[in-house]
Amino acid sequence: MTVQQISIFVENKQGTLLKVLELLKEANIQLVASTIADTVEYGIYRIICSEPQRAFATLKGAGISVAISDVFALTLDNVPGRAADAVRILTQEGIGITYMYSFLYEGKGILIFRTDNPDKTR
């Protein structure tokens, strides 16, 4: 299945991430999962949240550089090796993973990922 992910571009300076989190808190938007990928000058803070459209509008309205996109969400049994099994299938099908992160939800492992071939991934 796919879910909407918010990508927030934040400067690598103290307080920038706090501003984003405070805006989401004030809007009563719950974070479900998040990850940060950084470069020298900025980071990309990716989140899965309770209300992605409202989160996008809230952050955009505050002048924050933000994007919304569909990513894949795969629910797995929370046992060793399940992520490897899932990635193996994608690899065998010639599908490359652009990025991936995971979290636990109600005792299940959830993989969030983007691929180089969304149509084939479906």
Map each language-model feature to its residues.
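A conserved regulatory-domain signal marking ACT and ACT-like small-molecule sensing domains
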Residues: M1-R122
